[in-house]
Amino acid sequence: MEYLLSIDQGTTSSRATLYAASGESLATASRPLAQHYPNPGWVEHDPQEIWEGQLACITEAVAKAGIAPSQIAGVGITNQRETTVVWERETGLPLHRAIVWQDRRTAELTESLKEQGLEAMVRERTGLLLDPYFSASKLCWLLDRVDGLRQRAERGEVCFGTVDSWLMFKLSGGKSHLTDISNASRTMLFNINTLEWDEELLRLFRIPRGMLPEVRGSAAGFGHTSGEVAGAEIHIAGVAGDQQAALFGQGCFAPGMAKATFGTGAFVVMNSGARPGVGDGALSTIAWQLPGEAVQYALEGSIFIAGAAVQWLQEGLGLIGNAREVEVLAASVPDSGGVYFVPALSGLGTPYWDPYARGVVAGLTRGSTKAHLARAALEAIAFQTLDAIRAMEQASGIALKELRVDGGAAANNLLLQIQADLLGVPVLRPRCTESTSLGAAFLAGIGAGVLDTSAIAAQWALDRRFEPQMERERREELHRGWQKCVRLSLGWEKN
């Protein structure tokens, strides 16, 4: 049997899973990851905790599976993207806490660049909007604020990387300073047209070229683990950012195929084929590059509050005792009774990109109940997904035929039925909803030569298909009501 090890580094946990090449999960181990909030809007991780947690997970998962590390054909890595790590090249020691993708400390810098009229240039080269979300402004902040860091970086003593780079450096015993093309595309320093680090963007953000990792295809081979670290020299065979890995794990290999991952937030990603999509609301990014093949691009929609809206019903309002109760409560009424909830609790993402938007509950009457608000919260997740997909359809010129889903909230049958009704296309839930981890394993399988995309596509198995049951006129009527409420929320904090 061929074994594949998937290393999945999330925002709140570290996880390692051992798979058979068939996609069967054999053993898994996880550790929580602490988040640090030194100032309002700041979010940090300890890179050493990331590394030590992953090492413990790898050791535990391999032991649970009862195999020797030497039996593993390939390691795949997937990770929270954009999170920025700097470390000393010689010792491998971190020089600052990692600045997490959620961190907003560089808002003034990105706003200033917008005011200088630079967003169109950045968008054309990277597919991304000028926003603190991405790595470039975070790295610029570190170079400016950490004493002596810029000078050391210019002397070649400092490495920068996203979390995949950090883990590869540590796993290889300091031999591999690499990243994959999907993670590079989230830094705002990588040109998605020329497929190179962009010299003009490096000058704009004042980043020394020598601190950047080498960029490789997603299954191109990334060296080997150190025998001292992992117990054997294992091929690091596949790497992708978490959302790209989930798209791959869902078998979305053809243009127009899309997946939505429902977690605290939600990410909707559509395969857009061999050319970047162009549109106002959706981000254009690189999905992956396989050996001997052209780069595959993707369109992405970011939804900041999805499952977190249900969490707010529980913790903020006390309407439910736990997240699982929301489905039963929402199903106790046939609709939301005209109640809308725009969960702009930390701004709105795709396609609005408004950090100043704030939450709105509208349409309340004397007959409104907590069940109506619970249903409105589920509808809010589905409406936001609809908005993101419409932006992607406009950018790609491709009409969505079905949506594959994963993540924790994909267990909510009512949510998925509402989603199908509002989209007007089937929503498909696979048997395995750990698509991110599985996608990293599949990329490792391709890199190790034990899998190909046709074998992966054949392994995708349906758990349940949700068919739309709502008339188009009713769907559009509900969406107009949603858009009216969104307009109320936009710019609220600024105005």
Curated annotation (Swiss-Prot):
Give the InterPro entries listed for this entry.
Answer: ATPase_NBD (IPR043129), Carb_kinase_FGGY (IPR000577), Carb_kinase_FGGY_CS (IPR018483), FGGY_C (IPR018485), FGGY_N (IPR018484), Glycerol_kin (IPR005999)
Which residues are listed for ATP binding in this entry?
Answer: 11-13, 264, 307, 311, 408
Q: Which GO terms describe its biological process?
A: glycerol catabolic process; glycerol metabolic process; glycerol-3-phosphate metabolic process
Q: How, per the record, is this protein's activity regulated?
A: Inhibited by fructose 1,6-bisphosphate (FBP).
Pathway noted in the entry: Polyol metabolism; glycerol degradation via glycerol kinase pathway; sn-glycerol 3-phosphate from glycerol: step 1/1
Q: Which UniProt keywords apply?
A: ATP-binding, Glycerol metabolism, Kinase, Nucleotide-binding, Transferase
UniProt xrefs under Gene3D superfamilies: 3.30.420.40
- One of its Pfam families is FGGY_N
Annotated glycerol binding lies at 81-82, 133, 242-243
- Any GO CC annotation of this UniProt entry: cytosol
* Amino-acid positions noted as binding sn-glycerol 3-phosphate in the UniProt annotation, renumbered to this chain: 11, 81-82, 133, 242
Q: Which family does it belong to?
A: Belongs to the FGGY kinase family.
Q: What is this protein called?
A: Glycerol kinase
Species of origin:
Citrifermentans bemidjiense (strain ATCC BAA-1014 / DSM 16622 / JCM 12645 / Bem) (Geobacter bemidjiensis)
